[in-house]
């Protein structure tokens, strides 16, 4: 298995971001990312997917070998779409659409029709910022997802950077503070979103969780002050999605795109907050009688299942079954649990950073049936 770091859900000048695709690629290379997925609002930008090198231009990338792994001289830029009904007020029900080669914004007025369109086109889709509260001091509306009766979407964006930001800026003074000290913002997904995820999993559905930066690199003006707040390279070092591939990236765009979206659709990934410390190397696996599984997989409970989690450095590890804690390991590198009952098992990991306990890793479930 091979781990890559993906940052997804970001915006360029084609919608409400401030940068170009080349700007974003440069920031991603600087941050050490492997892949970025751009998702402008209601527009599918064509012709810009590819491997970008430090010069900022797409170019063929050589096959990756052991000697080139870990280098940050190139990044794969893929393009998706964030689709929502622009005639709706407020504009709720945003959907992240990946691996679709045509604009689906004409379907935005009905979320289920949109999801069906994604599936018919061979794509995958995720509910964006499920809980996204208002921020009256900045005239920002609540744009949470409301159409929870929909079916057949791939998953949800468990941790969205700006959604969390909106909870800590009741005044413009708070906003000014966090504009200069963004490292103090991140604590974890919205509690309502975590609970919603567990509730959805309890229905028997497989719901994949992603982490999204929702990066815009916004320009802030307050009197004489001007600042680019939350620049792309900051976002790219914070909330990421680490994806587990069956083989390394090859350098061929079509091949690698298939690998990445295949792994995301299966839930072979985890949500990571890489700002306190790199989460590379986290694993959550299971072994049963003649079977094994990684995050997103299903295996039989008969005969017992051993669940194992490993983290890159000592941290607090929580094991949850059907949304309830069944194991807690403090200041530990690893956790092992023998599961004798069916259930949806997932792991949360917490780390101390800047004097506070913060969410670090949220693994996708292993389904023991």
Task: Locate the predicted segments by residue.
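A metal-dependent hydrolase metal-coordination microenvironment
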Residues: 2-153, 157-171, 187-199, 203, ...
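Residue-level preference for long, well-ordered alpha-helices that form the structural scaffold
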Residues: 17, 182, 186-189, 253-256
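A solvent-exposed, charged loop/short amphipathic helix patch at secondary-structure junctions
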Residues: 169-185
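C-terminal functional module detector
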Residues: 2-3, 23-24, 203-209, 213-369
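Short amphipathic alpha-helical patches
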Residues: 31, 36, 51-52, 179, ...
């Amino acid at each position: 298995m091979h781990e890559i770091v993906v940052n997804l859900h970001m915006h360029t000048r084609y919608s409400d971001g401030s940068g170009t695709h080349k700007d974003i690629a440069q920031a991603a290379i600087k941050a050490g990312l492997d892949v970025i997925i751009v998702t402008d609002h209601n527009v599918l930008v064509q012709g810009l997917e590819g491997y970008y090198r430090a010069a900022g231009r797409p170019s063929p990338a050589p096959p990756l070998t052991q000697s080139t792994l870990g280098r940050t001289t190139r990044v794969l830029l893929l393009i998706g779409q964030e689709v929502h009904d622009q005639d709706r007020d407020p504009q709720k029900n945003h959907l992240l659409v990946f691996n679709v080669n045509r604009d689906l914004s004409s379907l935005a007025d009905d979320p289920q029709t949109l999801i069906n369109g994604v599936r018919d086109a061979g794509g995958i889709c995720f509910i964006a910022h499920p809980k996204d509260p208002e921020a009256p001091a900045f005239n920002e509306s609540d744009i949470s997802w409301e159409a929870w009766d929909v079916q057949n979407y791939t998953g949800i964006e468990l941790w969205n950077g700006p959604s969390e930001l909106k909870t800590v800026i009741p005044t413009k003074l708070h906003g000014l503070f966090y504009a200069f000290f963004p490292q103090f913002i991140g604590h974890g997904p919205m509690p309502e979103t975590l609970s919603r995820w567990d509730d959805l999993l309890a229905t028997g559905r497989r719901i994949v969780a992603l982490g999204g930066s929702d990066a815009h690199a916004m320009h802030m003006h307050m009197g004489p002050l001007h600042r680019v707040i939350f620049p792309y390279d900051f976002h790219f070092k914070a909330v990421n999605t680490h994806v587990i591939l069956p083989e390394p990236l090859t350098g061929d765009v079509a091949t690698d795109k298939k690998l990445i979206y295949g792994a995301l659709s299966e839930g072979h990934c985890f949500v990571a907050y890489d700002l306190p410390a790199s989460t590379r190397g986290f694993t959550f696996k299971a072994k049963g009688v003649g079977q094994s599984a990684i995050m997103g997989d299903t295996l039989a409970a008969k005969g017992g299942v051993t669940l194992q989690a490993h983290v890159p450095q000592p941290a607090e590890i929580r094991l949850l079954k059907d949304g309830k804690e069944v194991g807690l390991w403090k200041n530990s590198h690893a956790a092992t649990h023998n599961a004798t009952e069916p259930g949806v098992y997932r792991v949360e990991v917490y780390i101390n950073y800047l004097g506070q306990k913060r969410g670090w890793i949220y693994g996708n479930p292993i389904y023991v049936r």
